Amino acid sequence: MIITDVQVRHFLSTTRRHSDSAGHAHPGPPHQVKTSILTLRTEDGHEGHSITVPEIVRPHVIDKYVKTVLIGQDHRDRERLWHDLAHWQRGSAAQLSDRTLAAVDVALWDLAGRTLNQPVHKLIGGYRDKIRAYGSIMCGDEQEGGLATPEDYGRFAETLVARGYKGIKLHTWMPPVSWAPDVRMDLKAC
């Protein structure tokens, strides 16, 4: 049950997610992006994985902080390991981010599930076999064919309802859209 190795592998995957100048996500044409998988391995060969982006699992951060805390430790001590890793954040000059801690936490839970041959939702007490999902609409934009008007939001919401969603979460317009925010436009979109 002792963690003996921490590895990061990179691969290409296809996404339709694009970001504007303020970092807000928008749909767009498919394109290739670099993706990373963080793997924790134990002495008996079990592995736990977490998929993330390369910036979250940079080699320096993994070597200096994650490996230092995890290697030689019992993976079942998830809470203590998380706190030990969080302790290093303060002195890391913002290199060890909450997202890195989250990626490690997911890999530890995945490792626990694989070791016990149980899905993680059962390990944390889940009892439902299905849950309702809501459709989340990306931020508004000024792009042709995007979410530039309240009517665009309405059409997209109708598409989500036709797909079976019972609830919809709106993200309306914000900078860098030139005229945002505008409460009247937000209300129209709703």
Language-model-detected regions and their locations in the chain:
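Residues that line or immediately flank small-molecule/substrate-binding pockets and catalytic motifs
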Residues: 10, 54, 172
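A generic local secondary-structure boundary/capping motif
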Residues: 26-28, 122-123, 157
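Residue-level marker of alpha-helix boundaries and capping positions
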Residues: 28, 99-100, 147
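Metal-dependent enolase-superfamily TIM-barrel catalytic cores that perform enediolate-based chemistry
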Residues: 130-131, 135-190
